Amino acid sequence: MADKLHFDLVSPERRLFAGNVDQVVVPGEEGDFGVLPNHAPFMSVIRPGAITVIDDGKETRTFIHGGFAEVTAAGLTILAEEAIAVADIDTEKLARDLSDAREDVTAAKDEEERDQAAALVAKYEAMQAVAAH
């Protein structure tokens, strides 16, 4: 049997995935990176985007937002503030949420409200880009 990478994907609500896979591609703050079995240890902040889990020739994509990735001798762990399977993204609801968030930026009464709304706009735009591909 070929080497496998142990991978854990954890959100605040629950563990979303735990198992052995061939490879995981992660949207790191400095760019996407791939993790294979026996990868050198490191940590990275993750940016909003899709992780791609590759196992036995099949790819599974999950949108993640916020958090970090840690590669150790034991494998890869991603602690994500939010995670949703790309196949489960409701693009119509997402378009409405994005429109509402953009309106909230315009209607914000102070800088804090504007920053919060702008952060939502950025998240929804990233989610929309992932869902489109």
From Swiss-Prot:
An example molecular function term from Gene Ontology annotations: proton-transporting ATP synthase activity, rotational mechanism
Keyword Lipoprotein applies: no
Domain of life, per lineage: Bacteria
UniProt entry keywords in alphabetical sequence: ATP synthesis, Cell inner membrane, Cell membrane, CF(1), Hydrogen ion transport, Ion transport, Membrane, Transport
Subunit composition and interactions: F-type ATPases have 2 components, CF(1) - the catalytic core - and CF(0) - the membrane proton channel. CF(1) has five subunits: alpha(3), beta(3), gamma(1), delta(1), epsilon(1). CF(0) has three main subunits: a, b and c.
Assigned protein family: Belongs to the ATPase epsilon chain family.
PANTHER family with a match to the protein in the record: ATP SYNTHASE DELTA/EPSILON CHAIN, ATP SYNTHASE EPSILON CHAIN, CHLOROPLASTIC
Protein's name according to its UniProt entry: ATP synthase epsilon chain
